[in-house]
Amino acid sequence: MERLILASNSPRRKEILQNLHVKFDIIVSDVDEVFNEKDHPAKIVETLAYLKAEDVANRIDRDAIIIGADTIVVKNGIIGKPKNKQDARDILRTLSGDVHEVITGIVVLDTSSGYTVIDHVVTEVYMKKITDEEIERYIATGEPMDKAGAYGIQGRAAVFVEKIVGDYYNVVGLPICKLGEVLHKHFHINLL
């Protein structure tokens, strides 16, 4: 199998690939995650994922398959990572008792040929009504501070999620089903 590189600093993306016992390296991209909020959310995550993969491709000196990804939460606009504890409170109150979308853009880029596949996955997440006391306890853990939407479905915030429609791993940050399909169909790489 060709060298596989994950262009991400996300511990969640790393863990998802490690759980599959896939051999890969990590090279963190230097891309600033700035975007035009007027663009469609799917376009934003696809573009950022591409820029991350391209940045890493331009910095390595041997052939590799590079995976780039970017995840955002959408409810009446884009919800990023909280800037501070008050922002986390506001975000969690916005998501409480309602549905929102989690969109992850993925890019797989072959540095030897330049062949690139760009796609995205959308998952709907239904949150229960979260009390202010629950929000305060959750924020006190520190868990929401580095996550889009101010929550981690794989962590303590699982108690807030009533149901999802779509790929669970997409909400975590790497839609492994779609990634597996892309790697198999376009790059002849099996994750099993």
UniProtKB/Swiss-Prot annotation:
Name the UniProt record assigns to this protein: dTTP/UTP pyrophosphatase
EC number: 3.6.1.9
Cofactor(s) listed in the protein's UniProt record: a divalent metal cation
Gene3D superfamilies hit by this protein: 3.90.950.10
Domain of life of the organism encoding this protein: Bacteria
Catalytic residues of the enzyme: D70 (proton acceptor)
Enzyme class: hydrolase
One annotated GO molecular function: dTTP diphosphatase activity
Similarity comment text for this entry: Belongs to the Maf family. YhdE subfamily.
Role this protein plays: Nucleoside triphosphate pyrophosphatase that hydrolyzes dTTP and UTP. May have a dual role in cell division arrest and in preventing the incorporation of modified nucleotides into cellular nucleic acids.
Subcellular location(s) of the protein: Cytoplasm
Lineage per the UniProt record: Bacteria, Bacillati, Bacillota, Clostridia, Peptostreptococcales
Catalytic activity: dTTP + H2O = dTMP + diphosphate + H(+); UTP + H2O = UMP + diphosphate + H(+)
Site positions per UniProt: Important for substrate specificity: R12, T71, Q154
Keywords of the record: Cytoplasm, Hydrolase, Nucleotide metabolism
A GO BP entry: nucleotide metabolic process
GO CC terms in record: cytoplasm
